[in-house]
Amino acid sequence: MSARVAVESSQCPKSVSVIVPVFNEVSTIDALQDQFDRIDFAGSRCEVIFVDGGSTDGTRDRVRAPYRLIDQEGRGRGGALNTGARAAEGEVLFFLHCDSVLPEGAFREIGEVLSRTRVGTFGIRFSKLTPVLMLCQVMSNLRVRFRHISYGDQGLFIERDLFFKAGMFPDVPLMEDFQFALNLKRLGEPIGMTRHRIRTSARRFPNGEVDRLRVWVNMARLRSRYVKGASPEELALAYGNVR
């Protein structure tokens, strides 16, 4: 496991497998690989695994050595993440969205957090800042700090054995990251958070502040329905109507 360029030192004491689910990400995958090219993993063995869910836009052809490309097994994002985890060799699994921009020293911060706890995430900030997105950003970071609930766009890193002990991500069309965080809480495993933030795209939000607020509120309602017993399949149907 390699991929080392002496520009930024990771200083993470454990081997890390970065797992990135992709589906038609030709517009983002080059920029993410460029980020990895600039990182020196400082002797901590690291691998990057792209898990493709059937891209048709040329995403597969853009993956370059030494990064790995494998085909997804199972359905949904949870299936992609689990496929990557099973193929990974690292002591730490780092699940990352393809449109993410890591802060400087990201792997060093992963090591710092994992010296205190067994699972962690990054604080989040959006690439575009509007009043609604700033509110969403603040609430997301407070949710991790006080409720130990993290979502996929924040970048989750976890010790490999704990990931499998927690049951992996559920094979469901929606809420896989939310349910996994709940599983960790039941195991008594708090999610730590880095000092610096990961930057993520606001592309899941529509244009216009009113529409952004509507999506944010409706997503909170979907999570509330899930906690009360609604099935992920039922919520997935509703999800398409709230964006």
Indicate where each model-derived feature is located:
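Short aromatic/hydrophobic "clamp" motif used to bind/position activated sugar donors
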Residues: 93
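Catalytic donor-sugar/metal-binding loop of nucleotide-sugar-dependent glycosyltransferases
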Residues: 170-172, 182-199
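Conserved donor NDP-sugar-binding/catalytic core segment of glycosyltransferases
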Residues: 104-132
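A conserved acidic beta->alpha catalytic loop
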Residues: 35, 52-60, 99-101
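Acidic donor-binding/catalytic loop of UDP-sugar-dependent glycosyltransferases
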Residues: 58, 98-112, 182
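Short, well-formed alpha-helical segments that are part of the catalytic scaffolds
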Residues: 25-40
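Glycine-rich, basic loop-to-helix element that forms the pyrophosphate-binding segment
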Residues: 72-88
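Cell-envelope/extracellular polymer assembly enzymes that use nucleotide-activated donors
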Residues: 15-17, 47, 179
